[in-house]
Regions:
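Ribonuclease/tRNase effector modules and their secretory precursors
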Residues: 1-202
Length: 202
């Protein structure tokens, strides 16, 4: 069950009454130097926010402390933004397979940075963790992506899979897409996930 999994991952964030400390609270403890950094942080007890991408909704979502720090120091994305990542993933526009890592998905958030670059989250699915090989989904990065349309185009040409979520918000991130990708991501196209060959067949 959810709580048993969390206990095996990091028992210090499971309270006596069986509830799990919120991700927000974990971040506050990290800032205050009170978080035990040997353990990953638990963003969510389950993966319901990823249900348009994966059927394994029971996997908890984790993020390593080092990742949170890297996101802040390298990408200048603060804790307040990161603390909201579960909600942002839930409201993400669409996602697609990573070209680099078979098990990772690139999630396009409905968010932009100060220079209007889209912000993406990278999630590794079904990672096995620890002695008990607990299946988890891990957020491995969150950053602003310049030239995201180039990556989308390349990924599409490689026949990787795309997953649609709140694609009606696609205009809000305002980048240019090739016509066929634009069509496939639109509400006019009925598939909720697709590859280039499926779009061409249809």
């Amino acid at each position: 069950d959810e709580i048993d999994k969390i206990k095996k991952i990091n028992k210090s964030i499971v309270k006596e009454n069986g509830t799990v400390e919120s991700f927000d609270k974990q971040l506050i403890e990290l800032i205050g130097g009170r978080y035990d950094t040997r353990f990953p942080m638990v963003v969510s007890k389950n993966s319901k926010c990823l249900n348009y991408i994966t059927k394994n909704a029971s996997n908890p979502i984790l993020i390593n402390v080092s990742t949170v720090i890297k996101i802040k120091e390298k990408h200048d994305i603060g804790y307040a933004f990161v603390s909201d990542c579960e909600q942002m993933i839930k409201n993400s526009i669409f996602a697609f397979d990573s070209l680099k890592h078979d098990t990772s998905k690139i999630i396009v958030l409905d968010e932009v940075d100060d220079e209007d670059n889209p912000i993406i989250a990278v999630v590794r699915l079904d990672k096995k963790m620890g002695r008990d090989a607990i299946q988890i989904n891990e957020i491995t990065s969150i950053y602003e992506k310049e030239r995201l349309s180039n990556l989308i185009e390349k990924t599409y040409r490689e026949n990787k899979c795309f997953y649609k979520n709140k694609t009606e918000h696609i205009r809000s991130i305002g980048f240019q897409l090739p016509q066929d990708v634009k069509y496939a991501l639109s509400t006019e196209y009925s598939r909720t996930s697709f590859t280039k060959s499926q779009v061409e067949e249809d």
